[in-house]
Design a protein with these regions (language model features):
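N-terminal secretory targeting modules
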Residues: 1-48, 53-58, 199-200
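Conserved SGNH/GDSL esterase-like catalytic core that processes O-acyl groups on lipids
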Residues: 39-117, 142-144, 149
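Residues at the C-termini of beta-strands that transition into short coil/loop
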Residues: 67-72, 137, 168-171
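N-terminal cationic-hydrophobic initiation segments that often serve targeting/anchoring roles
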Residues: 93, 124-126, 161
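A cross-domain feature marking catalytic cores of carbohydrate-active enzymes
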Residues: 105, 135-137
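Generic structural signal for well-ordered alpha-helices
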Residues: 117-122, 153, 157
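A short helix->loop->beta-strand "cap" motif at the edges of active sites that frequently abuts
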Residues: 128-132
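Substrate-gating cap/lid alpha-helix
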Residues: 140-199
Length: 200
């Protein structure tokens, strides 16, 4: 009788153990076949500046906005000039993961010789110490910039270049810029992507 009881006890333990073992296997199978419903985007190459900034981001495959909504924390906002951007970057936290920063700035300040380009570049290097720096040339010939000449624009961005910032061609140019489908936005984005792809 004791022998029979021992056999039944062992069989019962084995059955319970198998049931306990199989249950997690079933759950694990369900988890492993579940497809994630999100895409992880690394924002390591960022565009910052004024209202023309998202138009370049639209066509770029390598560069993106920190946030689609313009604000100080997003480092871009419509109607803003270089000195606003310098303050926004100053208030931004240190980020060593950013690989490149592209400025799209100058238009709203009418490419003023008084803009503190040195200050903007220096604080950007402090906040993003591992980043390559690029700049997009703005637009003129419209609104408050109707009398601005290409010579003024060239001189403005030459100041960036003198500080080690790569100037991207072509400029947005002499046009009303608030049209995402302007061909120059596509060309600028393509040339920017080429530069980013060559980063080491």
């Amino acid at each position: 009788m004791r022998f029979l009881f021992s056999i039944l006890f062992i069989v019962g333990i084995t059955f319970i153990s198998n049931e306990s073992f199989n249950q997690p296997q079933y759950k694990l199978h369900i988890i492993s076949t579940t497809t994630p419903k999100y895409t992880l985007i690394f924002k390591n190459n960022i565009l910052i500046g004024d209202s023309q900034t998202p138009f370049i981001a639209k066509w770029s495959t390598n560069a993106t906005l920190l946030n689609k909504v313009g604000s100080e924390s997003s480092l871009w906002k419509g109607g803003q000039g270089l000195n606003w951007l310098k303050l926004a970057v100053t208030n931004y936290k240190l980020d060593t993961l950013i690989q490149s920063v592209t400025f799209c700035i100058g238009t709203n300040g009418r490419f003023s010789s008084k803009d503190d380009i040195i200050g903007l570049v220096n604080i950007t290097k402090e906040r993003f110490p591992n980043a390559y720096l690029y700049v997009v040339q703005g637009s003129w010939g419209w609104g408050g910039n109707v009398n601005v000449t290409k010579e003024v624009v060239d001189a403005y961005y030459k100041r960036f270049n003198g500080l080690g910032v790569e100037v991207i061609n072509p400029p947005i140019g002499k046009c009303e810029p608030h049209n995402v489908n302007l061909p120059q936005y596509k060309e600028i984005a393509k040339n920017l992507d080429t530069l980013i792809s060559a980063q080491k």
